[in-house]
Amino acid sequence: MHKDTKLLDEIKNIKSKLKSGKPAVAPKPTPKQIKAWEETHKSHLNLDTKNSSISVPPPMPDHVLLQTSKTLSVSTLPNIKFNTINQAKFLKAIEDYDLDKIKELISSNTIKIDSFGKRGKLGKTPLQYAIINDKPELAKLLIDAGANINVKTQNGRNLFELAMYNSASDQTFELLLKTNININSMDLRALSRLHNKLFSILLKPANDINTTIGKFNRTLLHQAAERNNIKKAQISINHNINVEAQDITGETALHMLKTSKMAKILLKAGSNTEAQNKLGRTPLHNAILQANKRQVNIKNIHNIVLKLIKSGANPNAVDYYGFTPLEYAIRINDSKIFKLLIKNNAKFKKNRYELFCQALESGNLTATKYLFKKEFLNNINDKNGQNYLYYIATGGNKEVLEYLVKKNHDNGKKILTQFVDKQRNTPIHIAAQNGQFEIIKNFQKLGFDINARNADGETVLHILARAQNGEMIKELIKLGADINIKNKIGKTALDKVEEDFKGISKKISNKQLQELFEESNIIARTGRIEDETKYLYQYRQDGYYKNIEREGNRGRSATLLVPEVNISLFFTGIGLLYNANDSTIRHFMPHDFWTDNARRTEDFFNMRLDNKKFVQTHSKEKFLKTYKNFLKDNPQKDYNEIIANLYPKGLIGIALQNDDLEHKLYALEAKYYVSEKYNMDLPMTIVKNKKLIP
């Protein structure tokens, strides 16, 4: 193709400038930039130059110095005979931790002690560098020499915060405590990270201990409760922190309990057990809902619930959704909490049959037994037109089903097998939609017809074929499911499978996938069903099939795997062809592609390109071309924006700073490389890593 000569000329021009040593010209500052610098360092510009202890301001950028030199009196500036060579030596000595050289250069009075180091080296003032790297001796030397102790980073962190975030030693903190640093400006989020001794020291009356921080407007007590830091919570309470303070969601520290010990401390300090957040939930509601989260110590949750109830928490409090703690205990299937609430006079706020159905849906056997009444088995439908069999099929707890079958033995099997919903789905259809294979087997034993059709003429096999659930298809065929039954549009379950494979083939147009499709087509036509379903199961072994199973498959088969979209099948096909590992696919769910969360999409492709097996199987060029064509058909995303993130991590960053010739050169080379290799136009970007060109 025709080379971009203009781009090549610009690259050559920059290289010649770098070779000749000609410095980059700094951009002209705006009046706003000049004013901002003057305001920041106003105190330094009015120093008494006779005072031997001079605090030198951070370096005035050259372009600012030129603009302000006409208005500033020479007598107001520090009396320093600045030497650029000595300044370079000073910064080098800081990096090398050469204390003797540093002392020598400071005494020469030819350096700016608060000067920022060159980008890529220090990137901060020498004192900030000393604090971040935990070098207390160097920090003391610089402070004694007049370094600015109130200097802040670009994101507003002072020296104390830098020490906290970088886990500095006690010596560094002790040094900072002896200075007159402004602690009032400290970020309380950083303060909460301190170990308890320093945390206690810094909570001085000058600080407003009830100051809220972060986007949720939380106090130190909120943070201590959330992290279960007992000592910090006690110290905060001893300093008269407001235990009833609410964050932006209306939650107090008591809503964030992790252990009963924290509950004891907060309750002793007067925390209100009836405080409600913006969803109307009390600390008891929140504690019970915690039990439904992964990686939670369920014993701790039980102890918290017990502690709250003993302290007077209302077990019948209703949130804005109309739920009581008892109903949440039923929904999360926690029998111990359910029994504890019943023992402490928890009442039903809803219809008993409705709660009974909730217990069935969550598979809560204890609640099912407690709520059961004989008349519930007389085929009663709830307000949604469903009866108890629907909820058993959804919940999938065979012990619950066995219990109700025993209770229903007088009525026989006829009532059990009569139920259909508005779409004429039987409990077997519903169980298949939710991936509940064991319940399907139990229903069949009770006399349900495994080949029953719904209003669309579909059997359970049609549903499983649409969900790409090959393992269940295989097992149901063994149980007698008929593969030749057609739905109302004349399609069998195997016809549905073929349609899905054709959809993938059209999207990717890859020879390997086409061969696999043809092979599966032959297998299907010859009737070797076990081989066909085995292939389907292997096809789903990329991790996505397992993910659906783990999530209960509720509703996802209908929304994510419909043939009109085929997005999930497209990316799953890529996973199969390129031998991606399970973790890569599990990090990428197709519906995220259509949301604003482009980051996960970009991360997916970064991981894909880092995958050695993928690189060995398929070239980057062909993959990028495939992806580019796909995005052209789906203009919801700007392909240039995402393509810029398709390279291995660390190559290309976010924005180009035109005053840096080296970075500009790398960015231009990147632009040229992409235009030549992929016939694409990359946005101008700054390169994080100089090893750009492969």
Swiss-Prot record:
ANK repeat windows: 122-151, 155-185, 216-245, 249-275, 279-317, 321-350, 351-382, 384-413, 423-452, 456-485
Keywords: ANK repeat, Repeat
Superkingdom of origin: Bacteria
Protein name stated in the entry: Putative ankyrin repeat protein RBE_0921
Organism, as annotated: Rickettsia bellii (strain RML369-C)
